[in-house]
Structures are given as C-alpha cells and as structure tokens.
Amino acid sequence: MSIPAVVAHGGAGAGPERLANVERAVAIAAGILESGGSAVEAAVEACVVLEDDSVFNAGTGSVFRTDGSVLLDASIQVSDGRMGFVIAMEDTPNPIRVAANLLDEEINGLTGEGARIWADAKGIEKAPVEGRPPFKEATDTVGVIARDRSGSIACATSTGGCSDRPPGRVGDVPLPGCGFWVQDGVGVGATGIGEAITRGMLSFRVAERILDVGDLEASMIWALEECLEDDAEVGIIALGSEGTGHGLANSKNMPWSSWIARK
C-alpha cells in the first residue's frame, strides 16, 4: 500500500503571494486522499479549486488572446495509461472536468466547438468565461499531481494560454509528454513558456530521468539546465511512487505546495 501524497503549482512567475491559494487546493486533494479517494478524484477536484480562483490563468481567471477571445486547455493522465485533454474550449469554467470525462472513452482528445458539444452532452457546466488582461506577474498554468493508497498517480493541468498568442495557438498543457506526463511510478507537470516546454518534450524527459536516477530534485535541475532554450522561464512539479512531491523553477517565482499522509 502506498502513502497518499499531492503536489500542486500556480504557474511559473505567479509570485509567492499566491502560495496560500495553491495550499487551499492541496488541502482539498489531501482530504480526498485521506478519506480513501482516488488520485484522479484528488487531482481533478484540486485543479477545479485552482480553475475557480481568478488569480490564476486557468478556468475563470483565464486571460485574453490577441483577438480578445478566451480559450481554455486542460489535460489529465493516469499512471495506468489513460489520458484526456481538451484544447481551445469556450464557455467552460472547468475544462479539467471535460478532460477527465474522456479518461474512460475511446477518444482521448477534443478541441474547440466539438469539445463543448461533448461537454453539453455529458452535463458539464456551460457558462461564460469573461477573461481578463494578464497580471503584471504572469502565470500561465495550474497543475496538480496526486498519488493514492493503491499507488495510482494522476496529473491534472489547466490553462487559459498566453495573452500574447493568437487564438489558434496550442501550448504545452494539452500535449502529452510536454506539459504533462504520467507513467507507472512517476508523474510530472510543467509550466512556463509553452513553446520551449514542447520543443524540449520536458515532462516526458523529466519522468524518464526520475525513473533512471531516482531523485526528483536532481532530475528537475538537469532538465532546467539541459533540456531548454536559453532564457526560457519554466517550472516543474513531480511526484514519484514514494515520498513527497517536489517543485522547482528557473523563473523568479512559482508558488507550489506539497503534502504527504502520515504513515
């Protein structure tokens, strides 16, 4: 039996003043895990807390694209191989719920209007997301990784994208191996400059490194030094098959928090 744990972040560059907001999401996940809930449930519900918090660029706090539109991405992957992701959704305060709904479906990815039609058919809330200009201290993604008593690991990520990008742009969040990666024994989530994360296949490479060397922090340091373009601001969170989760960033700030159950 594994010891439940969770780690979450509020985005690269978000600033330490948002740490308490991240800690609230971690507390929700911890409560679910302590009561015997699954890693998927814990990761999704904690991600919903972050999506519902307007200080983050995800869900209700998502920023405008260059044309004034508000387009939301989200993803989830589980260590048993299941995944779901959605791209460029409108009128969806909690896109992570749509992504999670795909975990047990034949398809695992949806985009745009088709994603919203699917969500309508599944009874997932449809409501306007008004959007906002970016804050001075940018934040582009939220993410949660949870491990339950069975040893299952799940990673949930969500974003409103970058405010200086066009409406058709796809960042790292919904791309497997880039903004997220989970396999047996490890889960990784990334945040920051999506193009750099994508070109570096960052989350997959960090996960492979962790499984190879067995050290979360050392693997993150290696990735930030060796897998990215110069000056790309990026943060990473990771959780292994045992022990606590960890977070690390080369940006000025990345609020992150972790929890592990008592033995």
Where in this protein do the model-derived segments appear?
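Alpha/propeptide regions of enzymes that mature by internal proteolysis
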Residues: 1-263
